């Protein structure tokens, strides 16, 4: 909603028409993941999308100067481009030409977090029980 409002506020709508860009209303999580999975490139300032694009293997340009998700830059598909329009255009062109960054899904993003948590909790609980039994 903010992006659409700013496009209208600054009279930039004419830059979007005819450039295969579509402004969508807010999406639910599953709908957004479906859109991301089919994307050739994602430009965002959202931390969550940096993670989702890395998990999906989709190149992501983050239009910020910093990130709370550095693993998406270090190992994933995310590239920080800030607000420098030259860097944004250059990186986007590289990605669209097939020469962009090819990251990987971080090791612990394997879908088994719940199993590891349950195992660690069980181990901790057994330790707590044994500790109480010996006192």
Name the predicted role of every residue range.
Residues 3-135:
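Nucleotide-activated sugar donor-binding and catalytic core shared by glycosyltransferases
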């Amino acid at each position: 909603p903010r992006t659409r409002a700013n496009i209208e506020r600054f009279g930039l709508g004419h830059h979007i028409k005819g450039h295969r860009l579509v402004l969508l209303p807010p999406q639910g999580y599953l709908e957004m993941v479906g859109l991301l999975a089919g994307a050739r490139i994602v430009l965002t300032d959202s931390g969550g999308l940096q993670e989702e694009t890395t998990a999906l293997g989709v190149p992501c340009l983050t239009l910020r100067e910093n990130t709370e998700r550095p693993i998406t830059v270090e190992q994933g598909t995310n590239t920080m481009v800030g607000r420098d329009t030259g860097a944004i255009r250059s990186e986007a062109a590289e990605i669209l030409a097939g020469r962009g960054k090819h990251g990987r899904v971080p090791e612990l993003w394997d879908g088994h977090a719940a199993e590891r948590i349950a195992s660690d909790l069980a181990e901790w609980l057994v330790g707590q029980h044994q500790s109480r039994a010996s006192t």
